[in-house]
Amino acid sequence: MAKAIRVRYAPSPTGLLHIGNARTALFNYLYARHHGGTFIIRIEDTDRKRHVEDGERSQLENLRWLGMDWDESPETHENYRQSERLELYQKYIDQLLAEGKAYKSYVTEEELAAERERQEAAGETPRYINEYLGMSEEEKAAYIAEREAAGIIPTVRLSVNESGIYKWHDIVKGDIEFEGGNIGGDWVIQKKDGYPTYNFAVVIDDHDMQISHVIRGDDHIANTPKQLMVYEALGWEAPEFGHMTLIINSETGKKLSKRDTNTLQFIEDYRKKGYLPEAVFNFIALLGWNPGGEDEIFSREELIKLFDENRLSKSPAAFDQKKLDWMSNEYIKNADFERIFALAKPYLEEAGRLTDKAEKLVELYKPQMKSVDEIVPLTDLFFSDFPELTEAEREVMAGETVPVVLEAFKAKLEAMTDEEFVTENIFPQIKAVQKETGIKGKNLFMPIRIAVSGEMHGPELPDTIYLLGREKSIQHIENMLNQIQ
C-alpha cells in the first residue's frame, strides 16, 4: 500500500514571509494538492533570540493572501509549535542518553573558540573533538563533577559514526551522500537552555507528524546527513527529501540577497503595492519549476493539475522583476474593473485624488498598471504640474511641423462647445488637422500627445484629452508652443 502523502511548510516566526520561503510553501502546497495529500503548517519557534512578535500571524496571513489553504496547523491542532513540544523532545533526548547514543557535553564556548582557532592556525578543518577522549571512567566522573560544581550547564551531543555513509535519493538533485567523518564531529542536539537544536527537533516533528516528503531549499542539503543520523539513532525510517535550487537575481546572477534593493523580496511588499495575489502565486510557481510548453499564465487550479515534481529544475531559478511585472499587468488587465477600482480607491484617497473622475481614470490606466498603487503616478498629469520632458520627447517637439500641428489642433479645441467636447468627438478633430495640414502618422499624433500629457506613451489620446478637460488641454498646448517657438 502506498504511503500517504503528508508534506509540511515549517517557518520560523522571525520576520516577514520572504519570496524564497513562499516558494517552499507553494511547492509543498502544489505537491499535496496534486497528489491528494495533506498540507501541514508547523511553526519552528525554538530560536527564541530571533523570535519576532506577530511573526507567526504575518506568515499565515500572507500565505492566505497568496491563495493557499492547509489541512493542519497550530490554528486547528495542538502542539504544532515547537515551543509546545519540549516534553516530546526531552523524551527522545533521554532515550538517546540512556542508550549511550548521546552524551552531556560540558565544554564551554571559550574552549570551543580556542580549539577552533588552533585548528584554523594549523590548517585543519574545524571540528568538535570529544572532550572525554582518552579519559578513564574515573577521570570522566571527576571532570563532570568539577564542571557541575563550577555551575557549567551542559549541552547534549549526538555521537557521530565517523565511518558511516549517509545517502539519499533526492527528488530534485538525484543521489547525494555524505561521509560521517565530514560532518564536524559530534554535534549538539540540545542547547543549554533545554531547547533542541533545529536538526534534532525537525526529525522528531517530521516522524511524529508522519511527514512523507520533505521539500525545501537546497541550503538545507548540509542539514540532511545530520537529520539522517537522528533517524538512524532512533531506528526510524526517513522521509523522502527534495531540495529546490537557489533563487538568483536575474541581473547579477548571484543568490538573491536582501541587499538587492531593485527586487521586492517580501510578500507583504507585494500586498502593499497592490499586486494581485494570483499573479504572485503564478510567478512564484514558475521559480524553479516548468510545466512544459510556451504558456506562462496559469490559474491556481491549472498549476495544481500540472504540477510534477520530476520537472523541478536542477539549475538556479532566476528572479526577474520585469517578468513578474509583465505577468502582474496581464492579470490586472484581465481582472474585473470593479475589483481593480476597489483596490485603487485607498491609494487615490491617500493621494487626495478620489474625485468624481476617479472611476474613469482607473478605467483609463488599468491596462498599464503593473501594480495597483501605480494609479497615483500614472494620474499625475491630472493633479500635478506638467512633467519635465525627456530628451527623446524634446527631440520630437523640435520637429519643424510641430508648431503647425499644435496651432491647428488648439484651434479645433477652442472651436468646440462644452456639449461637443466629449471623447468620441476628439479623434475626428485630430483627423481634421491631418486633412488640413497634410501631416499624418507619428508627426501628427506624437506632438499632440506630448503637448497635452507630457509623455510619448499612454492611454488612448482622446480619453486623456477628455479627462484632462478642454481648457487644461488648450493651456498645455499653449505652454508647449511658447517653449518651442
Curated annotation (Swiss-Prot):
Keyword Aminoacyl-tRNA synthetase: yes
TM helices/strands, residue ranges: none
Catalysed reaction equations from the record: tRNA(Glu) + L-glutamate + ATP = L-glutamyl-tRNA(Glu) + AMP + diphosphate
Residue sites binding ATP per the record: K258
EC nos: 6.1.1.17
GO cellular component: cytosol
Keyword field: Aminoacyl-tRNA synthetase, ATP-binding, Cytoplasm, Ligase, Nucleotide-binding, Protein biosynthesis
Residue interval(s) of motif 'KMSKS' region: 255-259
Chain location of the short sequence motif 'HIGH' region per the record: 11-21
A Pfam family annotated for this UniProt entry: Anticodon_2
Localization per record: Cytoplasm
Organism expressing this protein natively: Streptococcus gordonii (strain Challis / ATCC 35105 / BCRC 15272 / CH1 / DL1 / V288)
Function: Catalyzes the attachment of glutamate to tRNA(Glu) in a two-step reaction: glutamate is first activated by ATP to form Glu-AMP and then transferred to the acceptor end of tRNA(Glu).
Gene Ontology molecular function: ATP binding; glutamate-tRNA ligase activity; tRNA binding; zinc ion binding
Assembly, per entry: Monomer.
Main subcellular location of this protein, as a coarse class: cytoplasm
InterPro entries reported in the protein's UniProt record: aa-tRNA-synth_I_cd-bd (IPR045462), aa-tRNA-synth_I_codon-bd_sub2 (IPR020751), aa-tRNA-synth_I_CS (IPR001412), aa_tRNA-synth_I_cd-bd_sf (IPR008925), Glu-tRNA-ligase_bac/mito (IPR004527), Glu/Gln-tRNA-synth (IPR000924), Glu/Gln-tRNA-synth_Ib_cat-dom (IPR020058), GluQ/Sye (IPR049940)
UniProt similarity note: Belongs to the class-I aminoacyl-tRNA synthetase family. Glutamate--tRNA ligase type 1 subfamily.
Name listed for the protein in its UniProt record: Glutamate--tRNA ligase
EC class of the enzyme, as a word: ligase
Gene Ontology annotations of biological process type: glutamyl-tRNA aminoacylation
